[in-house]
């Protein structure tokens, strides 16, 4: 149980209305507060959260600190925020979101921080600290590797493969994990990464069948393809458009379509270049 959960347990979650009060921040403090709110939103968007949820959370945080008039506009790559202080002055800042993906663990941590801020309403110094220097759970590469292997092997068997196909898909899953880890560190373009990784995954599946590790090349490929499928991204894009966030929804939809095209292109290229090994 983290420090935020402990505080929530002791104090309870106060309502936002009760926490509102006229803010007494000066200009420099208001600029810092807005900077912190934008950083919070940036971290939120980077986890794959819906932009509607991000906007609502940021507006609520502004109201908690006395900024009743707050306008937030967020898309997958940009957040713009405007607030008005007690003297009627408007403050506007924006932040570019360069990182994107799906990280449910980090999303849960951010939700916990959000609840803590709503409950305790920390001073500006503490707010700046907990947002800009968050406590992150250490990644566990071994468990992630096991997840890749289990997912690839299980899907290969689920779609009609035998145990040998599942084992071959799991072995290829190890290489997919290693490629994913390496390319993510290099911050390579996601479409280029998907195309490259799909090609090598397809090539490894063909090689595994050629040497007798696997039996049905199509089942092995299907199992490994499932590691690349942008299913959550596609679902979120449709949900964003239903929430009338057309720009954010279209951005995610186009990204999902390009990713799917890269997957198909990578596997097709491996079949064209190495397909002769199957004869």
Which residues does each PLM region occupy?
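Core alpha-helical transmembrane segments of integral membrane proteins
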Residues: 137-211
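C-terminal ends of transmembrane helices
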Residues: 133, 176-187, 235-248
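Generic detector of multi-pass transmembrane helix bundles and their immediately adjacent loops
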Residues: 210-279
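Soluble N-terminal domains of membrane-associated systems
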Residues: 1-122
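Alpha-helical transmembrane segments and their cytosolic membrane-interface
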Residues: 99-165, 255-264, 275
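Generic secondary-structure signature for well-ordered alpha-helical cores
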Residues: 46, 63-67, 115-119, 184, ...
